[in-house]
């Protein structure tokens, strides 16, 4: 299949990578797995046994007229432990490489189908100036955009760093969430070829 390039002639690309069906279920699974993998999972609270103190019972079992109490660190008491205390856990979900690649292909194909993929021969800024990059993007009518190139140019990265709706990634650093999150994905021809190598 052919992919239109903004500032040059159309290029021939793999039908497998850029022309497949959109598998919403698989993409959803990939996004959930990616976001779950980013969770820290270090939340921890104290149960009644973790809270300091509470070894000796506050009063004897019988004869006081009060309700029986075995420890001052019971969850019922102020200063006591938590009933179902959170424990550190691993939230990551297993996703096979084959499934991940298929999800990425599905996302790229959907970007092409919905005209959200803007292909350019090359994209760079001469100086690390936000104003220069903003001017370039405005000329292309791009406001909410992910810029994907074969390798991240330092000037481009620095120029985009202060723009809230612009991000710069290389092909290896692209993920399902970032590709979906932006209105448009600006991608260089070399990055397209790299995606074909990795996902083909």
Swiss-Prot record:
It comes from the Bacteria. Coiled coil: none annotated. GO terms for molecular function: rRNA binding; structural constituent of ribosome. Gene3D superfamilies: 3.40.1370.10. GO terms for cellular component: ribonucleoprotein complex; ribosome. Residues 38-72 are annotated as: Disordered. Pfam families: Ribosomal_L4. The keyword Zinc does not apply. Disulfide bonds: none annotated. InterPro entries: Ribosomal_uL4, Ribosomal_uL4-like, Ribosomal_uL4_dom_sf. Keywords: Ribonucleoprotein, Ribosomal protein, RNA-binding, rRNA-binding. One of its GO terms (biological process) is translation. Part of the 50S ribosomal subunit. One of the primary rRNA binding proteins, this protein initially binds near the 5'-end of the 23S rRNA. It is important during the early stages of 50S assembly. It makes multiple contacts with different domains of the 23S rRNA in the assembled 50S subunit and ribosome. Forms part of the polypeptide exit tunnel. Belongs to the universal ribosomal protein uL4 family. NCBIfam families: rplD_bact (TIGR03953). This is Large ribosomal subunit protein uL4. It comes from Pseudomonas fluorescens (strain ATCC BAA-477 / NRRL B-23932 / Pf-5). The gene is rplD.
């Amino acid at each position: 299949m052919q992919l239109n390039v903004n500032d040059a002639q159309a290029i021939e690309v793999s039908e497998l990578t850029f022309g497949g069906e959109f598998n919403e279920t698989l993409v959803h699974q990939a996004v959930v797995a990616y976001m779950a993998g980013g969770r820290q999972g270090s939340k921890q609270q104290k149960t009644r046994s973790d809270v300091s103190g509470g070894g000796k019972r506050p009063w004897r079992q019988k004869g006081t007229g009060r309700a029986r109490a075995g420890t001052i660190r019971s969850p019922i008491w102020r200063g006591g432990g938590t009933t179902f205390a959170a424990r550190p856990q691993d939230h990551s979900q297993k996703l096979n490489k084959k499934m991940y690649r298929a999800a990425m292909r599905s996302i790229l194909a959907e970007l092409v189908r919905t005209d959200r993929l803007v292909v350019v021969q090359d994209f760079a800024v001469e100086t690390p100036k936000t104003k220069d990059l903003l001017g370039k993007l405005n000329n292309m009518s791009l406001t909410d955009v992910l810029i994907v190139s074969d390798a991240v140019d330092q000037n481009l990265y620095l120029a985009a760093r202060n723009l809230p709706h612009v991000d710069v990634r290389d092909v290896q650093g692209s993920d399902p969430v970032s590709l979906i999150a932006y209105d448009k994905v600006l991608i260089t021809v070399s990055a397209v070829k790299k995606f074909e190598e990795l996902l083909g």
